[in-house]
């Protein structure tokens, strides 16, 4: 039996921070590993994670994710005290950390987690974005553009069914 050429599967998304794309304009995105405990991995496999109020900060040359809520399972761990909002260390190279530190300190950028996903089936990765907060008028422009795209698609569909 001949094996078919299998394309690399897209990473399975665990959670997305939808609010981040509305609140921030990202100029650069990068992938970071995350240091987790066993009960956290089990909870993530069950989909009990929330990134909505999450952000990344740098301290002593290391990156930490704050505000990521992982709800512990009742059966996950009986001998460890589970803290759902503990700090999670992000695993980045020294070069990446130095770059982030320079941009955050000098140019006022924010580091925000965008999504969490599985890499190669076993590794949890976090996509972080380096961006600046949007002003209110920027948010309104984005909303208008989104509504225009929906309206345009509706008109095109209507014209297609007529003709």
UniProtKB/Swiss-Prot annotation:
User: What are the UniProt keywords, alphabetically?
Assistant: Cytoplasm, RNA-binding
Gene3D superfamilies from the entry? 2.40.280.10
What gene, per UniProt, encodes this protein?
smpB
Q: Name one GO biological process term.
A: trans-translation
Q: What InterPro entries does the annotation carry? A: SmpB, SsrA-bd_prot, SsrA-bd_prot_CS
Compartments where found: Cytoplasm
The protein's name is SsrA-binding protein
Q: What is any Pfam family matched here?
A: SmpB
GO molecular function terms noted in the UniProt entry = RNA binding
Higher taxonomy: Bacteria, Pseudomonadati, Pseudomonadota, Gammaproteobacteria, Alteromonadales
The UniProt entry's sequence similarity note says: Belongs to the SmpB family.
């Amino acid at each position: 039996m001949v094996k078919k050429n299998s394309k690399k599967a897209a990473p399975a998304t665990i959670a997305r921070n939808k609010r981040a794309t509305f609140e921030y304009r990202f100029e650069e995105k990068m992938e970071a590993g995350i240091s987790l405990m066993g009960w956290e991995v089990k909870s993530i496999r069950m989909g009990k994670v929330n990134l909505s109020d999450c952000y990344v900060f740098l301290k002593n040359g290391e990156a930490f994710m704050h505000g990521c809520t992982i709800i512990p399972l009742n059966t996950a761990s009986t001998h460890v005290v589970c803290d759902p909002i503990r700090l999670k260390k992000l695993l980045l190279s020294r070069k990446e950390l130095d770059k982030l530190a320079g941009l955050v300190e000098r140019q006022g950028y924010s580091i925000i987690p965008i999504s969490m996903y599985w890499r190669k089936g076993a590794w949890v990765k976090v996509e972080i974005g380096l961006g600046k907060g949007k002003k209110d008028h920027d948010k309104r422009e984005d909303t208008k553009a989104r509504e225009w795209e929906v309206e345009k698609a509706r008109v095109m569909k209507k014209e297609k069914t007529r003709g």
